[in-house]
């Protein structure tokens, strides 16, 4: 009898099996809710949201007109607000039409991969990674390419990244501050990465996109500066969510 699910779905299941076993059938799963146990497995907030956020959300969910069901497209006011925020906070200039609103960064990752990859394209990601990168890449028929961090610094292993690039490479996912290591990648590494991607794109006559997952970019301690990879490489896609910093 043939497999009841598609090969693509089977690959997604394989990519996530270990994680879901940990979340559902491990010591963590059995004891995670015990009093005094802190859950560091997933980047969820451990405190209730501030009252001001709750109030704003309660007001915003009131339908504005009779055609309230869902939001069918980007809203110009939201796009303009994001442009101004990025300019003042990051020093990165975008046009309003560059902004695409999604239901969180998970959806942004999914939409981006579906837009820039074709089946068989390779997508590099840094390991250890956020657990669902590989499954998302596989879900669009692309090939996940795992590159380990520098074991001493936990920073980018630039030589390994350069060696991992092939004529089929379409994108690289950079997550800074990194989940799970917490490392903020410094400007020198990001500039060197940009040079590698620029040279490889020219050599292969095919643009390699940098997907910058910046979900944790406002959760930084000890007044450390933050550097967006998008500042150094023009063929970048900045992915952001309000879900992580609005605790």
Predicted features, each with a name:
Residues 236-247:
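Active-site PLP-lysine loop of aminotransferase-like
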Residues 43-45, 176-179, 244:
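Short glycine-rich anion-binding loops that position phosphate/pyrophosphate groups of nucleotides
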Residues 1-19:
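Conserved PLP-binding active-site segment in aminotransferase class I/II-type PLP enzymes
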Residues 66-205, 218-233, 237:
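Conserved core of the PLP fold type I
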Residues 210-211:
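Residue-level marker for buried hydrophobic side chains located in beta-strands
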Residues 11, 148, 181, 243-245:
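Glycine-rich "substrate-gating" loop/helix at the edge of Rossmann-like oxidoreductase active sites
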Residues 13-104, 111:
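N-terminal small-domain helix-loop-helix segment of the aminotransferase-like
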């Amino acid at each position: 009898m043939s497999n009841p699910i598609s090969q693509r779905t089977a690959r997604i299941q394989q990519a996530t099996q270990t994680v879901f076993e940990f979340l559902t059938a491990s010591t963590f799963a059995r004891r995670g809710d015990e009093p005094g146990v802190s859950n560091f497995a997933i980047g969820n907030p451990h405190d209730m949201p501030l009252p001001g956020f709750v109030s704003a959300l309660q007001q915003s969910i009131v339908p504005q007109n009779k055609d309230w069901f869902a939001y069918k497209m980007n809203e110009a006011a939201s796009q303009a607000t994001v442009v101004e925020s990025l300019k003042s906070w990051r020093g990165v200039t975008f046009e309003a039409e560059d902004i695409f609103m999604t239901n969180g960064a998970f959806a942004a990752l999914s939409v981006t991969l579906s837009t820039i990859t074709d089946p068989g394209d390779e997508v590099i990601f840094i390991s250890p990674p956020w657990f669902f990168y590989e499954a998302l890449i596989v879900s669009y028929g692309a090939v996940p390419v795992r590159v380990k961090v520098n074991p001493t610094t936990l920073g980018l292993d630039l030589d390994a990244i350069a060696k991992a690039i092939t004529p089929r490479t379409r994108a690289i996912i950079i997550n800074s501050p990194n989940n799970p290591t917490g490392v903020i990648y410094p400007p020198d590494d990001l500039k060197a990465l940009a040079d590698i991607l620029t040279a490889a794109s020219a050599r292969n006559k095919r643009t390699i996109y940098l997907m910058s997952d910046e979900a944790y970019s406002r959760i930084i301690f000890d007044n450390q500066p933050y550097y967006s990879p998008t500042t150094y490489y023009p063929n970048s896609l900045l992915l952001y969510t309000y879900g992580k910093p609005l605790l």
